[in-house]
Each structure stands twice: as structure tokens, then as C-alpha cells.
Curated annotation (Swiss-Prot):
One Gene Ontology term of the molecular function aspect: oxidoreductase activity, acting on NAD(P)H, quinone or similar compound as acceptor
Major localisation: membrane
Full protein name: NADH-quinone oxidoreductase subunit H
InterPro entries: NADH_UbQ_OxRdtase_su1/FPO, NADH_UbQ_OxRdtase_su1_CS
Known partners and oligomeric status: NDH-1 is composed of 14 different subunits. Subunits NuoA, H, J, K, L, M, N constitute the membrane sector of the complex.
Transmembrane domains' residue ranges: 13-33, 51-71, 83-103, 116-136, 162-182, 191-211, 244-264, 278-298, 310-330
Gene of this entry: nuoH
HAMAP family assigned to the protein according to its UniProt record, in alphabetical order: NDH1_NuoH
Length: 346
């Protein structure tokens, strides 16, 4: 059996497919419960009960919603480009999913350990905007088109800042491999070795940029209900709409994973002496997701001009300055052992 999977082409392909399923299926199941948690957190802030009917404590509400979307009729607008219309949500979801191929959950728990994993994720996540643009253009309606234009401008604007922020971490680590980045944060001081301390300003900027990149409140301008009804998703229903929604959630969880890997030590234990493991990775991702949900519940939506001004006039200059600052500190070992512990990979 082992020889079949390791020495034959068919076995190798089946092994890759099995590995993909072992990654995608738990991720999609987790999304259902994360969506439930998101709605419960939002309800708690607004002093409501939230989902509480389907299943114990409403735990099966997300599965009921998925089933509802699947059995609904798919209504295609008159004059829509049918091929592009149906391709758009598929592109959006696939681009979000394939980025997970290089995300490690523990030592060796990764589908593909690339030396340029950071560059791969950045490139693939940049392609997600094409699904949004295709959906807005193919719908043959003004509101989806305006929403897709907003989304394209917003995602491109904040991808620049995210790229510069990640460059600062790469300079500190000397590698674009996520496993190497996590190992660079290992040490006898536990969480004091993690990059959230020396790169705290960039952690703050990365979190806000991740909200904008994934179109989460308060930066959900592409689907502003008061202005654009539902943005680029206006003319979508049933399964295509569900694919768009899942793609957005996958992108949000991906940003949570990136935040943990880059700034919070990945699967490393926060307390010296406790064993490292996937438990810490998942716990940290849940904590970051909780912050995403709280921002959605308590922060009002920005205006579009404020969003663009924040990205180009505040985040971009500051993140560029930080890259130069980190490079200078690492090159000349300023502050001696303190910065050297963080800025030259330990």
C-alpha cells in the first residue's frame, strides 16, 4: 500500500487529493461554527440572543443556512454574461482556498513547505479581487459594478501596506518560509520572543489592513447596504452567493492564520516549559477572529474617501518607514542584544 502511494503516479495524485481533502473539509466545517460564533458575538454586543433555534444553542444554524442557499433557485439577471457570472464565485473561493496550501499548523503539518511561502500567499490573495470584478461586471447592473470597482481599489490599496509590513518580518527572520518565521520566534522567554513586541506598530497596521483586505467592517464599502444594497453580490442568489460568502470567510480565517504566524509565534507555547502544538495555533487564531468580530460589532463604517486616505496617506508611508527602520536596526545591530534577539532571526 505504501509503495502504491509513493512509487506510482496514480498513487501520488490520490495522495495529494487526500491531503487536500484533509485540509479543506475541516476548514469548511470550522467555517460553519465560526460563522455561528460571529453572529453570537455580534448579538451579545447588541444585547440580543442570536441564533438559538436550529440544534442545541443554535449550533446547527449555519448548516441550515448552507442547505437553504443550496436548494434555492439560481436567478441569472437578463443580459448577464452567464459564463463569467458563474465563474466569478468559483474564482473567488478557489483563490482563497489554495492559499492554505502553504500555511503550517505545526512542525510538518503543512501541505507544501515552500521557501517562498509568504510570496505565494501574497500573490494568490491578490488574485481574489478578480472574482469580485468578474462578478460585478458580469451581472450587467450598476450597483454590482460600482461595488466591484470599490473592492478592487480597496484591496489593491491595502495590499501594498500588507506587503511592506510582511517585508519587515522577513527582514527580521531572513526567510519567507512560515515554518522558519515561527522558529525564529522560539526562545527561552516564551511569548516575549514573539514578533508582536518589536513589531507592535506593524501588528496594529496589519490587523486594520487585513480588515480592509477582506472587506470586513468597518471597511465593507464594496457591499455598503445603504449605498449599494449588497455591492457586487446584489444579483447573486443560491449557490453562487454561498460560494462568495464562503470565499470571504476563508480569506478572513487566512488573515487570522497569517497574523498568528507572523506576530504571535504560530504553534509555539506562550509559557516556557509547556509543549508546543497545533492547540496553540488554533487558540491564537480564535482569539484573532474574536477581535475581527468585535470590530464588526462596535466600529462604524468609514466613508470611501476616508478609507483611501487612511491607506495611501497614513499606512503606506508608515509601513515604508518601518521597513527602512527594521533594515537599519538589523544591519547595524542597534540597541545591541535586545534588538538582535528579534531583528536578525534570534
Amino acid at each position: 500500500m505504501v509503495e502504491f502511494f509513493t512509487q506510482t503516479t496514480t498513487g501520488a495524485i490520490l495522495l495529494i487529493l487526500l491531503q487536500c481533502l484533509l485540509l479543506v473539509v475541516p476548514l469548511l466545517v470550522a467555517l460553519a461554527f465560526l460563522m455561528y460564533a460571529d453572529r453570537k458575538i455580534w448579538a451579545a454586543v447588541m444585547m440580543r440572543k442570536g441564533p438559538n433555534v436550529v440544534g442545541a444553542f443554535g449550533l446547527l444554524q449555519s448548516f441550515a443556512d448552507f442547505l437553504k442557499y443550496i436548494v434555492k433557485e439560481i436567478v441569472v439577471p437578463a443580459g448577464a454574461d452567464r459564463a463569467v457570472y458563474f465563474l466569478a464565485p468559483i474564482v473567488s473561493l478557489v483563490m482563497a482556498l489554495i492559499a492554505w496550501a502553504v500555511i503550517p499548523f505545526n512542525d510538518g503539518w503543512v501541505l507544501s513547505s515552500l521557501n517562498v511561502a509568504v510570496l505565494y500567499v501574497f500573490a494568490v490573495s491578490s488574485l481574489e479581487v478578480y472574482g469580485v470584478i468578474m462578478g460585478g461586471w458580469a451581472s450587467n447592473s450598476k450597483y454590482p459594478f460600482l461595488g466591484s470597482l470599490r473592492s478592487a481599489a480597496q484591496m489593491i490599496s491595502y495590499e501594498v501596506s500588507i506587503g511592506l509590513i510582511i517585508i519587515g518580518v522577513i527582514i527580521s527572520t531572513g526567510s519567507m518560509n512560515f515554518t522558519a518565521i515561527v522558529h525564529a520566534q522560539d526562545g527561552d522567554l516564551g511569548l516575549l520572543n514573539w514578533y508582536f513586541l518589536p513589531h507592535f506598530p506593524m501588528l496594529f497596521l496589519f490587523f486594520i489592513s487585513a480588515l480592509a483586505e477582506t472587506n470586513r467592517p468597518p471597511f465593507d464599502l464594496p457591499e455598503a447596504e445603504a449605498e449599494l444594497v449588497a455591492g457586487y453580490q446584489v444579483e447573486y442568489s443560491s449557490t453562487p452567493f454561498l460560494l462568495f460568502m464562503i470565499g470571504e470567510l476563508v480569506a478572513v480565517v487566512l488573515m487570522c492564520a497569517l497574523t498568528v504566524l507572523l506576530f504571535f509565534g504560530g504553534w509555539l507555547s506562550p509559557i516556557p516549559g509547556l509543549p508546543d502544538g497545533v492547540f496553540w495555533m488554533i487558540l491564537k487564531m480564535l482569539a484573532v477572529f474574536f477581535m475581527f468580530s468585535m470590530v464588526k460589532a462596535i466600529v462604524p463604517r468609514y466613508r470611501y474617501d476616508q478609507l483611501m486616505r487612511l491607506g495611501w496617506k497614513v499606512f503606506l508611508p508608515f509601513s515604508l518607514f518601518w521597513v527602512v527602520f527594521v533594515a537599519f536596526m538589523a544591519r547595524y545591530e542597534v540597541l545591541g542584544g535586545f534588538w538582535a534577539r528579534f531583528a536578525v532571526g534570534g
